[in-house]
Design a protein with these regions (language model features):
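Solvent-exposed beta-hairpin/edge-strand motifs
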Residues: 105
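Extracellular beta-sheet repeat scaffolds used for adhesion and glycan interaction
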Residues: 114-138
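C-terminal segment of classical bacterial N-terminal signal peptides
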Residues: 16-28
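N-terminal small/polar-rich segments of proteins
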Residues: 29-101, 129-168
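N-terminal short leaders/motifs
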Residues: 2-4, 25-31
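Bacterial N-terminal signal peptides that target proteins for export
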Residues: 2-17
Length: 168
């Protein structure tokens, strides 16, 4: 009886257990195949620009300076030029901008590239704009404003709008 049980166990193991092991084993001489693919991208030159308001405060006939900041963010190594428009005041130019006040009164002012108020800021690249090269980070550029002396205008609020243009 013992012999019969041993034969029965051996037969059962060969039919059930051991053939299953063959399902998980790799056949002798297994091969692999490989391939490759290209990965590409194009980075376009781009720039973003924003600016803070320039507030002169109260004007009493004396020189009034003020500052604004133009923030330029361009892709790395992208050359750019920042220009400032003449504004919306009647008869304004980039050398003499004009804020409009009560009854269409005009108050002249200037925008400059330097603290000494000697380098006018206009719109002609290579002449009166500010040039730079993008580095991927925001680059702040100071705008120096000034109202000249001895303008005798009506009291009230004066305003203008300047358009900042970044050419790249």
């Amino acid at each position: 009886m013992k012999r019969r049980s041993a034969i029965k166990f051996a037969l059962h193991a060969s039919l059930v257990g051991f053939p299953a092991l063959g399902l998980f084993a790799l056949p002798a001489g297994a091969a692999t195949a490989t391939s490759s693919f290209a990965v590409t991208a194009t980075v376009a030159s781009t720039c973003l620009v924003s600016a803070t308001s320039l507030g002169f405060g109260s004007y009493t006939g004396l020189v009034v300076p003020a500052l604004s900041t133009v923030s330029v963010t361009c892709t790395n190594t992208t050359p750019y030029n920042v220009g400032l428009s003449a504004g919306l005041g009647t008869g304004a130019t980039v050398t003499t901008r004009k804020m409009t006040g009560p009854a269409s009164a005009l108050l002249a002012y200037g925008l400059f590239q330097d603290a000494g108020h000697t380098l006018n800021w206009g719109v002609t690249a290579g002449t009166d704009t500010v040039a730079g090269t993008g580095n991927g980070a925001t680059q702040p550029i100071t705008v120096y404003g000034q109202i000249p002396t001895a303008q005798y205008v009506a009291p009230g609020a004066y305003a203008d709008t300047i358009t900042v243009t970044v050419t790249y």
